[in-house]
Regions:
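Soluble catalytic domains of enzymes that build or remodel membrane lipids, polysaccharides, and related
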Residues: 4-138
Length: 138
């Protein structure tokens, strides 16, 4: 089954920020390995009064988005280690390799996801797909 058919109406944000329904901004980041990746500061929304959500494949730096005013930052990439004992390595590499952390006003979430890198196996790491329900206060 071709995935392109399934996701035909899905817009992939690659170093882009868009306004959703005049209610919040959504930014999708290029992967950290892309040498032409745009700085997050260049993707900052014009209206700082609206919430700003950033999707970044790798949770490589949480300080910059917090300082720039990101409200919600979501990542994956780490696979929560994927196989024991790799979780100890990802905990050393990333400030947040799994779960939730608040930095200033920003809430950061890192999911273990459901894929893999390298060997097609996961041991001691729970696969997951999150549904995040956001409620805006008036």
């Amino acid at each position: 089954f071709p995935y392109t058919t399934l996701f035909r109406s899905v817009e992939i944000l690659m170093d882009e920020t868009i306004l959703i329904g005049e209610r919040f901004y959504l930014t999708g980041r290029e992967d950290l390995t892309n040498k032409s990746r745009v700085e997050l500061s260049a993707l900052q929304p014009a209206d700082s009064a609206l919430p700003w959500f950033v999707m970044n494949h790798t949770p490589d730096d949480l300080d910059e988005p917090a300082k720039l005013g990101v409200d919600f930052h979501v990542s994956g990439h780490t696979h929560k280690g994927q196989m024991w004992p790799n979780e100890y390595i990802t905990k050393k590499i990333f400030e947040l390799d799994y779960g939730h952390r608040q930095k200033e006003q920003m809430h950061a979430l890192v999911s273990s996801g459901f894929g893999f890198w390298g060997p097609p196996t996961r041991i001691g790491s729970q696969s997951e797909l999150w549904v995040i329900d956001i409620q805006f206060s008036k």
